[in-house]
Amino acid sequence: MTADPELDAAIAAVEDQFGIVFNRARIVWAESAKLVHPELQPAGYKLLSSIVRAGSTNAHALAELYDMDKSAISRQIRQLEELGLVESRADERDGRARVLVPTSTARDRIARVRAANQARLRNALAGRSVEELRSLADVLRIVAAG
């Protein structure tokens, strides 16, 4: 709390809206996971999205990115492999290490889901000016930086 009750109320309103946004994000992740594969869990969807975005990565990098336990990452990766969405290959730079590579099926399904999610976001933000959207992106960047 600060000495400015108006500022405190405004920050509380922002916090409330972030809670709503985070809840909505969890719902979208769950829906998106099911669109990729009926057996895919939301955590697996997030990992798969990151693997597709990166082109290839490793379990250690994913564990750091999502601050997840390595055993949880391993379980999700095993499921992604079983569903035919990810392949584990020897790292070309270090044959002892393994890299995760999305399959073409995964790339196609993630692209479709992302297109639908982006259309939803575009509809939600319709009517906002480019300047408003840039300001929103700036505020989100500040919040994400901590």
Where are these regions (language model features)?
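Short amphipathic alpha-helical/adjacent loop interface patches that line ligand
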Residues: 18, 22, 44, 66, ...
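N-terminal helix-turn-helix DNA-binding core of bacterial DNA-binding proteins
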Residues: 27-71, 77, 83, 99
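Short, locally clustered residues in the helix-turn-helix/winged-helix DNA-binding domain
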Residues: 23, 49-53, 114, 141
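Charged, amphipathic alpha-helical coiled-coil/dimerization segments
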Residues: 78-138
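Helical hydrophobic small-molecule/effector-binding pocket
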Residues: 25-28, 108, 112, 138, ...
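N-terminal leader segment of winged-helix/HTH proteins
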Residues: 1-42, 142
